[in-house]
Amino acid sequence: LVGSEMCIRDSLYCLEVRCPQSGWMVPVLPTLVISEGHRVVARLVPDPVRKRYDISIEYVDAARWPEEKKRAEAQGTLPRVGKGTLVHSPDGITAYRTRMSTIRGDYRDEQGNNRNRLRPWEKEDIVPRPEDILQERLYCVQWIRETEEAGRAESQFRAVTEADLERERRVTEYVRAHLADWEAAGLLPDMKIEAGQETNRLLRERGWTHWRHLFNPRQLLAGAILRRHMTAETAPFVMNALNFNSRLCMWSVSKSIGGGGAVTPVFYNQALNTQNNYGCRGSAYLENILVSRLSVSPLPDVAQAEVLNRPAEQWEEDYDFCVTDPPYGDAVNYEEIYEFFIAWMRRNPPEEFRDWVWDSRRALAVKGTGEGFRKGMVRAFRRLAEHMSSGGSITLMFTHKSGELWGELTWIIWAAGLRVTASWYVVTEKDSALRTGANVTGTVLLTLRRAAGERRAWRDELEYELQEEVRAQVERMNGQNSRLAGEESGGLYQPVDFQMAAYTAAMRVLTGCDVMDGVEMRREAEAPGVRAAAMVDALIRYAQDVAEELLRPAGLPAALERGWNMLNAAERFYLKTAALEREGPQKLDMYTNMARALRVAGHERLMSAESRANNARLKLSDELGSGDRDPEDEWGGSPLRALLNAMRLLRQGEEAEQVLAVLAEDCRGRYALLR
């Protein structure tokens, strides 16, 4: 492409709906930011004659960018803070607000089922029909040309032109003309979307009835070409290309992704998420996915190994190492999302896959809840324990925020005659948007071996061991976060990751104990009694409390990092929860749990009066006012409380010298900590 004409890297599409109040066609855009890295925004230009908006694209200079970015985020027609409300103003004065549920025509039928007025698509539909409620429009194109400088490219985001629209029409007509032939040759999906927990949203939110509807005409054309030339060796890469080229591919504006905006994969969070706006890769830029290489770690030539795959309950041979990722809790509905790929593979697959059963076998899917699941897990791991060689091990992948499920897994491991001997945490989320707030950023790998000996311990002994184990784990993670605090990512780990680290530490200690407070745990695990279950749950909660007590916010100033342990519990509570608030709204129970872990009494006085169950926050310095400053009180007499009061005084216009004098008096002998 060097020296050639520019080609399309990405095409951006969005829904478009008619506002019932104004009669205008409105593009559905959560934000008008196109690219943070390139400082690009979209502008809605009213066209009163046609009662619709043209969309212009504008580059913003660095000096104006912070303000323009904030404005563009606020001017999206479906703002995230609007909770599903479409907002637009043709004249800049009158704002029309309509719930998307109203536009869709949501209602409940006589049986109480949620329904709407969206037309179910016919199999042959590849774009919305003119009468459909949800239309689709191209609103921006990113053009690119390679330069002679290695690794550099010239890129431009441009508004849509009549030439772009003509190309869209040509592609659509070409795909329509060849649809039947491609389907007959097995190059396109012909499979209907089966109802399910994950797949129901496709019909409910878009009216899609067949898997091909998840792809626009450009994507169907690219998919058919790739499918025609696919071999057994290239099949994984072709399927991954489809993962990056669907109507479900979110357009990320983040500077940390793609340098300034990129198409994210369908399964960035293992779900079928419909998008109000999405990105479509140009064919030339699917190449880097098609030519990617799998990471391999070959065994030494002297080693002889056989790799086997089968259900654990059917295992009959002895083995040395086993790797498993069992379902648990609200596990991913793999049996449903597999069908995204099965739809493309089932017709006329490469010769090597002829004997494969191209069916997701939903009826056989194991669900990770209930007594039946627990007993099935015990049987599976017991069978694996029986066939494990003397030095063998199982690597178990597990990730979940629920302490209850970690407790259940502990009982399963006990009942199977196994113990946790090692664990490590792998960060798997690279997207900064996913590495925030309550999102788990990785997965835990547990090493299981056969239980050895009969170790007896009392609860107070185990609490001491848990404290030491959790402390060592948290200090390692805090150290890594401190080293990375200067990076934009804000550190590797979020608070929920420390919580999971506490759970794994608890499992290492607990499963290594055979008799606890006189209770034989492996026998008890067959049907845990109330007393034993309560004791295990309490120890797991204790480990979580220890982790939360030790947790420090990422990015602390050096002086505060050194003096963190000098802060009292109320100060640490305020700083930790304030750090979490930077990631977005928090639930009220997060503050309650943190206060319990840090043993902070009366934390409610630090909470805003506006706090609700699903949207809570701390009081700001102005809201704290001048009260609650009793020098004998843990919070009222703390340097942090004094500092917040000083900030309030400065905001009110008090002289800096006078405020410093008040601050010094309030802090008395602890002023050095604040310098």
Predicted regions mapped to residue ranges:
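Conserved beta-strand signature within the Rossmann-like core of class I S-adenosyl-L-methionine
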Residues: 392-398
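A short glycine-rich, Lys/Arg-flanked "PGG" loop and its adjoining helix->strand segment in the class I
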Residues: 374-390, 415
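Nucleic-acid modification enzymes, centered on SAM-dependent nucleic-acid methyltransferases
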Residues: 4-320, 331-366, 380, 404-405, ...
